[in-house]
Design a protein with these regions (language model features):
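Short, compact, well-ordered microdomains
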Residues: 75-123
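N-terminal domain-onset segments
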Residues: 1-72, 108-123
Length: 123
């Protein structure tokens, strides 16, 4: 990140989307709102070029490998069906992932108003 820093603050769009996902996710998702308020984005970048991000929560260790989905929604980007989910690992808020369902994973995060509940991904 800037000046060699390994973490940066969430952008307003990232924070808004993550907050919305936690508010509309699984029953345990709301329990992660406090962690989101202390989260930063790591320097990790997905090699595919998508907009996925990883979190580092202040006063918590790095989240171990693993995915516990807290919220999972779908949206359309440039005519392709895509998905976005926020997840934790071992009780630590870990990241937000975008993925392609009917095409490539999008290089941008969706706006919450464009999300709908994830339907079956079978084509």
């Amino acid at each position: 990140m800037e000046d060699g820093q390994p973490y940066r603050a969430l952008t307003s769009q990232e924070a808004r989307l993550a907050s919305w996902l936690l508010a509309h996710g699984n029953p345990d998702a709301l329990g992660y709102v406090g962690q989101l308020e202390r989260a930063q984005v790591t320097a990790w970048k997905c090699p595919c070029g998508c907009a996925s991000i990883n979190f580092k929560v202040e006063d918590r260790p790095e989240a171990p490998p693993g995915v516990h989905t807290l919220a999972d929604f779908q949206f359309v980007h440039e005519g392709n069906l895509c998905g976005v989910f926020i997840y934790s690992s071992d009780g630590i808020l870990s990241g937000m992932e975008v993925w392609g369902i009917s095409g490539d994973a999008p290089p941008v995060l969706p706006e919450p108003e464009n999300l709908s509940p994830l339907e079956s991904t079978e084509l």
